[in-house]
């Protein structure tokens, strides 16, 4: 078995590490650098440049130089975040046939984000092969903890395109914890990993413990924002420079791709310089020209001004920390150490915000650019058997479930559940004689299915026709160690089964992910009322169904006056079910239960046989199995 390399596939930079002599080691690329820019360029003569070579020529070839494509993986072109990026990058973002966000070269060639990422992975693979002197085919690749199923699949696809068998997808904060904690002594402790990279933000609360001589890393909770990172900080600086230049010269540089690329490089440099100095000067001669001649950009930027420009971005990263702590059932005082990961954490304002929130200074002995790759290499070593006595227990970031009767989202696996995991639940049909059901798989935190992210739909056909509520359909969710979901539905009577590896059409947008949790908090009361209304409707539907069956069975044996009262109560309840008044539905249900009980008693007395009315009783409730029933849902056009 060859080496399993560890790769941090970053938005801005990527890093490669291996296990050597039982310890992680970062491998320098062909240029001698320990990190590689995640940039790919296509030249006029057909050459593909990757890393520093691509970055060097970006100013002269902006429309064919692709960076930060990790922010596009698993996203639809129509996503608000993608639309926001359209005018902020010099290259073209386009819509693929399935609605996904792709990129296009100046001559119109369309490329998937996975293809661009694969070029970066190919360079990392070759770097490893040159260093090791042997072929490398296996890797552990990191992703943001808040990446969803689609984005994880896309990352695996990028690895496959690059010729790598991706043995494991591992969350970036978890990898950083592995790198930090593997050799640390001192007993059990809880740490927070604050990971603010080039394009994404994650925070994970992790417990490191010694269990029977084995070092165990257990993720207690994770949260994040898949569209917050250093690129957003750079954009604030770019916007400021563009606005200042526009005020001074009356020229909007946003319409000039060449100027935009120069501004991006200058903004990034200025941001980095201001981490160690109080003031810098952005000087870009010949940035553009008009009828009066060439124009030069020369603007002073202070650290205080930069901090004011990005203040809301820094504050935006603190709320996920609060949620993660709450989900873990901890207070800030319970966290012994805070680890900073990602290049953007070098900014003093970010470090101060983290220190203020957690009430302790974050550790400075972890390299924010290399820790994630080292952790990936350690996980590769565990899989290959080179690293012993390490157990990693990660979690799924969002709840997973299906849509059930009444538009309810029924959770099968809760968020922050340790993976790999498997869970199943038994459901039933909503209609008499129903021979097929549609399983609608969703991801999110809202009670109402329509507010969650649709991941996939598939049909289970061939169900033996039977009265509603009788078929037993077992739906199973299986999340593997990569966080990738497999769903199956099985008719327990016929043993007919349908399995699917969920491959979503796109990833979750930033606003969708954040709002899933935020809206769940804000709409908790609304969701509770909706849930109660659906339960009342479902109970009423079951009561109507069982009462009609009782009329059919016993109607000829009892008086017409009683049947008339039952029919009248049925009509009133059927009308109430069409409305949204839970109290009225419950009141009409109670009335029907009472007259249906009279029907049952009359039929029993008539027959003098005790149990022939079973199933028609007023208290005939919807079977427990049917509390969350299937309804056939038509494919929407998300």
Swiss-Prot record:
The modification Phosphothreonine is found at residue 200. The gene is dnaK. The keyword ATP-binding applies. It comes from Xylella fastidiosa (strain Temecula1 / ATCC 700964). SUPFAM superfamilies: Actin-like ATPase domain, Heat shock protein 70kD (HSP70), peptide-binding domain. Induction: By stress conditions e.g. heat shock. This is Chaperone protein DnaK. GO terms for molecular function: ATP binding; ATP-dependent protein folding chaperone; unfolded protein binding. Residues 598-621 are annotated as: Disordered. Belongs to the heat shock protein 70 family. CDD domains: ASKHA_NBD_HSP70_DnaK-like. Acts as a chaperone. Keywords: ATP-binding, Chaperone, Nucleotide-binding, Phosphoprotein, Stress response.
């Amino acid at each position: 078995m060859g080496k399993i390399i560890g790769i941090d596939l970053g938005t801005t930079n990527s890093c490669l590490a291996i296990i050597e002599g039982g310890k992680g080691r970062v491998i320098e690329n062909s240029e001698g650098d320990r990190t590689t820019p995640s940039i790919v360029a296509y030249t006029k003569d057909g050459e593909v440049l990757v890393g520093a070579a691509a970055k060097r020529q970006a100013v002269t070839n902006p429309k064919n130089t692709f960076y930060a494509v990790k922010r596009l993986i698993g996203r639809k072109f129509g996503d608000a975040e993608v639309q926001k990026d359209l005018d902020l990058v010099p290259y073209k973002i386009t819509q693929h046939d399935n609605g996904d966000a792709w990129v296009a070269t100046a001559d119109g060639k369309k490329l998937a984000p996975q293809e661009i990422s694969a070029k970066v992975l190919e360079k990392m693979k070759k770097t490893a092969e040159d260093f090791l002197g042997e072929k490398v085919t296996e890797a552990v690749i990191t992703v943001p903890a808040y990446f969803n199923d689609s984005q994880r699949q896309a990352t695996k696809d990028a690895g496959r395109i690059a010729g790598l068998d991706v043995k494991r997808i591992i969350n970036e904060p978890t990898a950083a914890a592995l790198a930090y904690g593997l050799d640390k002594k001192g007993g059990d402790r809880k740490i927070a990993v604050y990971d603010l990279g080039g394009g994404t933000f994650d925070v994970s609360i992790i417990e490191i413990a010694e269990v029977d001589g084995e070092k165990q890393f257990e993720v207690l909770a994770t949260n994040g924002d898949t569209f917050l990172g250093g690129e957003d900080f750079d954009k604030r600086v770019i916007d400021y420079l563009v606005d200042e230049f526009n005020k001074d010269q009356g020229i909007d540089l946003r319409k000039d791709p060449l100027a935009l690329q120069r501004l991006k490089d200058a903004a990034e440099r200025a941001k980095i310089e201001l981490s160690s100095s109080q003031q810098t000067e952005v000087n870009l001669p010949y940035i553009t020209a008009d009828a009066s001649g060439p124009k030069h950009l020369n603007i002073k930027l202070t650290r205080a001004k930069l901090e004011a420009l990005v203040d809301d971005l820094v504050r935006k990263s603190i709320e996920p920390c609060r949620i993660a702590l709450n989900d873990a059932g901890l207070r800030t005082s319970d966290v012994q150490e805070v680890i900073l990961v990602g290049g953007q954490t070098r900014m003093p304002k970010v470090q101060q915000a983290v220190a203020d929130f957690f009430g302790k200074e974050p550790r400075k002995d972890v390299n924010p650019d290399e820790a994630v790759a080292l952790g990936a290499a350690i996980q590769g070593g565990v899989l290959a058997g080179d690293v012993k006595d390490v157990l990693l227990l990660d979690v799924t970031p969002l709840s997973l479930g299906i849509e059930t009767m009444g538009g309810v989202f029924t959770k099968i696996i809760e968020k922050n559940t340790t993976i790999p995991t498997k869970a199943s639940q038994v459901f039933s049909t909503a209609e008499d004689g129903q021979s097929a059901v549609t399983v609608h798989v969703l991801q999110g935190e809202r009670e109402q299915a329509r507010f969650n992210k649709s991941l996939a739909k598939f049909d289970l056909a061939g169900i033996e026709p039977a009265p509603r509520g009788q078929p037993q359909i077992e739906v199973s969710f299986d999340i593997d160690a990569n966080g990738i979901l497999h769903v199956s539905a099985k008719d327990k009577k016929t043993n007919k089964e349908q399995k699917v590896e969920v491959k979503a059409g796109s990833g979750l947008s930033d606003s969708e992910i954040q709002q899933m949790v935020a809206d769940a908090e804000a709409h908790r009361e609304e969701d509770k009322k909706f849930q109660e209304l659906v339960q009342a409707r479902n109970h009423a539907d079951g009561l109507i169904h069982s009462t009609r069956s009782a009329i059919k069975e016993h109607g000829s044996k009892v008086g017409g006056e009683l049947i008339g009262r039952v029919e009248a109560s049925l009509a009133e309840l059927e009308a109430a079910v069409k409305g949204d008044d839970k109290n009225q539905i419950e009141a009409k249900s109670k009335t029907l239960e009472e007259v249906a009980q009279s029907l049952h008693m009359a039929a029993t007395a008539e027959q003098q046989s005790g149990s022939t009315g079973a199933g028609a009783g007023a208290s005939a409730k919807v079977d427990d199995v049917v509390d969350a029933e299937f309804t056939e849902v038509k494919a929407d056009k998300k």
